[in-house]
Amino acid sequence: MSAGDLDRRAFIELVGGATAGALVGGRETGTQAGATSLSAAPSWIGPRPPAPAWCDTPMRWAQLVLVENDPGQFDAAFWLDYFKKVHADAACLSAGGIVAYYPTEIPLHHRSAWLGSSDPFGELVRGCRAQGMAVIARTDPHAARDDVAKAHPDWIAVDGDGQPRRHWSNPELWITCALGPYNFEFMTAVHREIVTRYEVDGIFTNRWAPQTDCSCEHCRRNFRAASGRELPRTTDARDPDRRAWLAWRKARLTELWALWDADIRRVRATACYIPNGPPDLATAAVMQPPIQFADHQARRGLTPPWSNGRRAKEYHAVMDGRPVGGIFSVGVEEPHRWKDSVQSEAEIRLWVADGTANGMRPWFAKFAGVLRDRRWLPVVERIYDWHFRHERYLRNTASLASVALLLSEQTTAVHTPPSERPVGDHVAGMYHALVESRVPFDLVHEARLTPERLDRYALVVLANAAALSDAQCDALRAYVRRGGGLVATFESSRYDEQGTRRPDFGLADLFGVRDTGRIDGPMKNAYLTLREDPRTGTRHEILAGLDDAPRVIHGVWRIPVTPLAADAPSPLTLVPTYPDLPMEDVFPRQERTDTREVYVSEPGRGRVVYFPWDVDRVFWEVLSADHLALLAGAVRWASRGVTPVTVTGPGLVEVTAWRQASSMTVHLVNLSNPMMMKGPLRELLPIGAQRVRLTLPPGTRATRVTLLSSGTSPVTTRDGASLTVQVPSILDHEVVAIDLA
């Protein structure tokens, strides 16, 4: 099969036989966009090559994105000196694509109009090599100039009316088709020239995926050959043609990734292709890239700082310990695109700290080689200097988390909650609850639910993981039977991986309920009564922290399930909705019912908590302290309290725990700031003393304990395998480092 023509056989193999079969024959099914996760590399890609040895070495990355008029104006010596000053051991440098920053010999590869006889890319590469740095070349293929459009009009993206697409920001440029010959042939030649001439360690491509839908002749022909369909005329993901197109798009990008990687390795065996973002994480799991970078440069709008750490967890869920870098911007990252701006020091520091605490290696990105605002330079220097001095404690070998939150790309792709709010709100609410409860946790990907992976954890959490396959349900069921804990909410397992509604929950036996097929809501002014066990006269452990509460607020959407056991515990029961206006009518029509709103059970050797309502989503919306207590109690009970570390003290602190070759670390990120939910931070505000109690890895003993940020040796108490460390204060990020013997 040629690199440029993905035929029907390859399409079916890549996206999965069952799903593709529903997409290629013109039959309408319940499958929606991107529902299929790859489980093995397609045969036409071949076995994945080993990771080049250099990939795991760099710990601090520097990226200089040149602009076209930089040649002859920017000071390359300054940047090389700055890379050295910040202890950067790898660089990503602009090379080609839209603009060539070297004397390219490829026709239509636009040389910078300011290039002259210079070679700024080559100068930077040589300077970095002299400093012992790894170097990857940045290319950007998403736009081209008039000469390209005239010579090869078929390389340009076409809109639904058959018109070539101008660039949305710079109308002098044209948007290229990412899935046709421009990438598969022209950019392949560009990459080959760069690697051949400069012997770089890899190619990193920005905006390599389609920037918009394309109706060019290549997309029409290749999509028809792969799927038997015409291009979709709608963006509605429920449309079968649209679903087929999205599956084909993913397959085509995977083919392009494999092509570029193989071609680069043929030129230089120790080099590789690194996409700036895979088609999805399931594809990254199959393609096994030797290194990946999370391009989540800063927060915008209503975004908490833990968002950077979340992106780290997402990549770690599929990277199997291979390195993950975190790209961060030194500017203001908002939709208005102030690319020459400078962000506050406090904001940059906390953003990078949260990524570091979650196992990302920092990568600063600077646009334009000519500096117009130098305020960020000492900020990055301070961050990188700290990182360099403590590198051996940041080269992690394993997460020590005992809780995992399920990452379900299937649910995101195929499921729309009844609230019509983003399905991600459920995950965000659960994520925030775990962070606020100071629970160290990982993300585990739905395509990787093997016993080996699941059994690392005492608990797996399903935050409305609505779309799960039978095999995924079986894996979770077996995990619980082996002794694992499970916390699940709302519609978890109600649909299969294609988004088709099941007659009953896929995990009904674990939840202890039967699906009635209904959903109630949106509810207003509904409540939950906290009940004692009539046999013991005490409340269930999941209600810990709510001792003085007779009732708490309910959610907005609930499933009226039928219990499988009449004598199951009933810690929470329904108080049905009643009027909230006029005020004279605001009284409950039923003070209490026996309708259970949480199901707790101990099937096999495991423990299960199931909330048949949207507790996680509502928590994200209103941040009720009572809902936080419910979620924290469920996690604590279902996990049997197993945790590598317990941290007590004032403030909102994110906690992570890691193992290194001869040490372990506990990261404490201080999120206690009035700008925590809406940046940028104005200043860092210290919080008071924290008590850290941790369990040493089996067969080890602590030889030294250090607080890396304060540079002090804390008061420490040993009790067998347990260690208690007193941390006097945290400004933004403290790391408890324990040397082991």
Residue ranges and their predicted role:
Residues 182-277, 282-283:
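Active-site neighborhood of glycoside hydrolase catalytic domains
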Residues 68-86, 109-131, 255, 425, ...:
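Aromatic- and glycine-enriched glycan-recognition loops and surfaces
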Residues 61, 90-93, 123-166, 272:
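Glycine-rich, aromatic-flanked loop segments that form ligand/cofactor-binding clefts
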Residues 47-49, 135, 238, 242-243, ...:
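Carbohydrate-binding surfaces of carbohydrate-active enzymes
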Residues 141-198, 233-246:
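Active-site-adjacent "subsite" loops/lids of carbohydrate-active enzymes
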Residues 4-5, 25-54:
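C-terminal segment of N-terminal export signals and the immediately downstream linker at the start
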Residues 2-19:
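N-terminal secretory signal peptides and thylakoid transit peptides that target proteins
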Residues 86-119, 144-155, 284-291:
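Aromatic-lined carbohydrate-binding/catalytic grooves of carbohydrate-active enzymes
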